[in-house]
Design a protein with these regions (language model features):
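Globin-like tetrapyrrole-binding proteins
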Residues: 1-221
Length: 221
């Protein structure tokens, strides 16, 4: 006997198509709409997952939903961030000798935007932030990732942990530009606390690396 598929009847096929239509419609909603529509499905508790985390459950949920919009444009956001960093702190370019921007172009936005080397480096940095945000609810995992990367930077000659903090405002500005009108006051507050945690943990990791490797790595004063 030939087995009849569950989709052999016109009614079943129509039901499947209707279901797909609903999914497609939801996917077309803006990130802002998706965030608002799904918050009610999450734990509305304001309790902190871990007392060392700067965000509660709902805020971490909102951060992850919003970050999806950024992650689709990470290359753009990353270049925007580093361009702002270098425009304000051109002296840091000595740490990025692989980025081919001539001295006379240090205040030229297009020079940074057209740099393939900067785009590549920006992508690496933004992937690190992406990894941290994706596991933000797991303090130990997130802290370990960031501390390890921060510690690695103690091997870079003349690099100082405080340089991480110079990325704070440029990051927030880049996020605001990419999100546009979806960057509500609430999301601004969430991103500020998230990036402060990320950058401070990187800085702490650098300090730990310096302490552990003092005999091997010496930085100039």
């Amino acid at each position: 006997m030939t087995r009849v598929s569950n989709l052999d009847t016109p009614r079943d096929k129509k039901a499947l198509l209707d279901k797909k239509s609903i999914i497609s419609h939801d996917d077309l909603l803006s990130p802002k709409q998706n965030i608002n529509d799904n918050v009610s499905n999450q734990d509305s508790s304001t309790g902190i997952l871990d007392p060392r985390l700067p965000l509660n459950r709902r805020e971490i949920f909102l951060l992850n939903k919003s970050w999806k919009g950024i992650s689709r444009n990470m290359d753009i956001a990353g270049v925007k961030m580093f361009t702002k960093i270098f425009l304000k702190n051109p002296e840091l370019l000595v740490l990025f000798r692989h980025i081919n921007v001539q001295k006379e172009d240090h205040q030229n936005v297009e020079a940074y935007e057209n740099s393939m080397e900067l785009e590549t480096h920006s992508e690496i940095v933004m992937n690190t932030i992406d990894e941290a945000i994706s596991c933000f609810a797991d303090y130990d995992k997130c802290h370990q990732i960031l501390s390890s990367i921060g510690s690695f930077h103690c091997t870079i000659r003349n690099f100082k942990g405080e340089y991480f903090l110079k990325a704070r405002d440029p990051f927030l500005q880049a996020v605001a530009e990419v999100l546009g009108d979806r960057n509500s006051e609430n999301m601004q507050s969430i991103y500020k606390r998230a990036i402060d945690f990320i950058l401070n943990t990187l800085c702490e990791g650098w300090k730990s690396g310096i302490e552990l490797n003092k005999p091997k790595y010496l930085t100039t004063p």
